[in-house]
Amino acid sequence: MKIIKGINDKNKNDIVKWTNEKGKDFLEQWAGKNADFPLTVSQIDNMNNIYSIFCENEFIGIIQKIRKELDNIHIGRFLINPELTGKGLGKRALLEFINLIFQEKDVNSITLNVFDYNVGAKKLYEKVGFRVVNVAKNPMKKYMMIMKKGEK
């Protein structure tokens, strides 16, 4: 598993294809409420700090460092090729990304949000060590989860 900052044009087109084939709900599930369907390359261009995920040199997805607040990094927009889910690749990619982030000396925690209906993603996050710290109910129920450096 390899994670590299940035995304090339071919891989942007893969993200657009995977997403638009799955539909509007799938886009919202990984990109949030502010993404417009159908997804376009220009929307991906507007996402800062995107990282490409590769498995055996094959592009399989993306993940984003959304923002840094003090000693915390908030992550999101985590997407694995839908044809490859259920094979443990998401877990491996997420663990690799967590390791990459925690190598930064001034980072002590990672947070993310996950919609209530995205049960599989929430289970994955809990499996790798995230825990729920807050629940927001408006406009849709979502969980804020955290992982602290050194915790599991």
Task: List the model feature ranges, each with a label.
Residues 2-83, 100, 104, 136:
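Acetyl-CoA-dependent GNAT
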Residues 112-122, 138-143, 148:
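Conserved beta-strand-loop-alpha-helix junction that forms the acyl-donor binding cleft
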Residues 78-89, 114-115:
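A short, internal acetyl-CoA/4′-phosphopantetheine-binding micro-motif in the GNAT/acyltransferase core
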Residues 54-56, 147-150:
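Active-site beta-strand termini and strand-to-loop segments that position acidic
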Residues 91, 116-134:
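Conserved active-site alpha-helix within GNAT-family acetyltransferase domains
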Residues 51-53, 91-92, 96:
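Preference for well-ordered, secondary-structure-rich cores of eukaryotic proteins
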